[in-house]
A protein has these predicted regions:
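Active-site-proximal cap/lid insertion segments
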Residues: 2-209
Length: 209
């Protein structure tokens, strides 16, 4: 879950891949993966995955059905991201914040302004989702495409995340890795004009693995 990794994996039949292809992030490997100097890395994996997702939607011609799974990992430890306007906005909003200093045994790097980092990650993900929907509309796919937004588990406490501060689980008990409802209950939002009624909430139970 490092956001400035040494490599990303790709498997694309449309690109002729017959096996997983490892793509080395050449700019990132010029700097340490942990500790001092890590902040000099510039290739942010979440942005790269999102850009590839938009390009993939753009490549669809509408003549054949398509199915895409966009595996965004925001928000998640480690709590780091580009020093852009999204992060700066939240740095100026929190009167109560904290720094999380990485212990020597952790795979996660130190996170300064951890509350602001987490909030900015949520906004960054929201921006990604908005851009995906905008791209579908631009291509004319929004009238016959079903979009599902979901997650894999409840909130976590690693890397400086603070679910109690944000009230993530409200009245639900537990967090990630626990079998209480707070650990296993996740959002599930479906969007599909003409297919899914807007503004409707139901109590249908399902499992997403």
């Amino acid at each position: 879950h490092l956001y400035y990794p040494n490599f990303l994996n790709r498997y694309s039949k449309s690109k002729g891949d017959k096996e997983v292809i490892r793509i080395t992030l050449e700019d990132n490997i010029q700097h340490p993966q942990h500790g001092e100097g890590y902040e000099k890395r510039t290739q942010y994996s979440a942005d790269m995955i999102h850009q590839t997702a938009l390009e993939w939607i753009d490549s669809q011609n509408g003549e054949q059905p398509f199915f895409g799974v966009f595996t965004y990992t925001l928000p998640h430890a480690e709590l780091v991201q580009p020093e852009d306007s999204i992060l700066q906005y939240y740095k100026e909003k929190f009167t109560e914040d904290k720094d999380w200093i990485s212990p020597h045994w952790s795979r996660y790097n130190t996170s300064l302004h951890a509350h602001a980092q987490f909030a900015a990650m949520v906004t960054r993900l929201d921006t990604y989702v908005g851009e995906v929907l905008a791209k579908l509309k631009e291509k004319g796919f929004d009238k016959n495409t079903l979009v599902i937004f979901t997650s894999d588990n409840g909130p976590h406490m690693e890397g400086g995340a603070d679910p109690d501060f944000f009230g993530h689980n409200a009245i639900l008990r537990g967090t990630k890795r626990q079998t209480h409802e707070g650990g296993v209950r996740v959002p599930f939002i479906a969007w599909g004009p003409g297919m899914v009624p807007a503004g409707v909430v139901n109590d249908h139970q399902l499992a997403f693995y």
